[in-house]
Amino acid sequence: MTAASPAKGLIALLRLPYWLMTGGLSVLTAFAITKTMIAPQTILLIFFSMAFITSAGFAINDYFDRESDAVIKPKRPIPAGTLSLKQVVAVSGVLFALGLVMAALINWFSFAIIAVDSLLLLVYSYMVKRKSGFAANILVGILTGTAFMYGQATITSPATVNLVSLSLYPIAFGTIGGNVLRDILSVDGDSKVGYPTLPQKIGRVSAAKVGALFFMLTGLLAPLPYFIGNFTIYYLPLILLWSVLLIYASIRLVTSASTVQNVRKYERIVTMSMILLPLALIAEAVLGGLL
């Protein structure tokens, strides 16, 4: 083991790209809702509180997945030997604590959301993932949706959540669909370690249709914040383009052969098109305040 191995293991454990998906999404939601400047310290607290909780969840999940990862994901920090079990648990505990403290510094409702997220992440890692793969997919979608609620809770006074962030929540359905497709692509490896994923229970063809349903729902409901009057017209162009791509992918998943190649193709389309969501929120935050 090289001296750099623990550092590399820590970086791998944190899953840094997901910080943009959680902390970044919360910050963009806050800006899109308020359409004004937010204090720099509040921005940092929003971003890192959600990001740290996300990494804490990944770390504790790696701890509980250590035996299966040794078989299907041997490069993960624990099976690769770059981090010990005690180190992984310590990192997870520290990150959970930091995330909760930062949320508490914003307001009580932000703390409550982060606390519930933390509990759900522990339940997911310890129990749900091994009992029901599809229930795990649903839970991940629920957790993703809380990023929108968190974004609003951090900038409203008194702290609250209403139709503004709740109208964004259905966007999280796309996360569920994406995880179902990824389960299809990893069905051989999951079967080796006994993960009861949806494709193993109902087959790849039916699972692809389930994933397509969630993409269709996301595509149809993504423009909702505009149509109920919460967001301005500037949110609409990019989000409608994303909706079209999601609906196209969902239709093709149902009408084309559910081969691994096709599933991978449409999963990539959906994944790459997700950049349109933060861009739409940026457009709303920057241009929406002009109306």
Task: Annotate each predicted stretch with a short phrase.
Residues 37, 129-132, 157-159, 186, ...:
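Membrane-interface helix-boundary motifs at transmembrane edges
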Residues 48, 66-115, 195-231:
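Multi-pass membrane catalytic core of lipid/isoprenoid biosynthesis enzymes
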Residues 2-8, 224-291:
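Extended hydrophobic alpha-helices typical of membrane-associated regions
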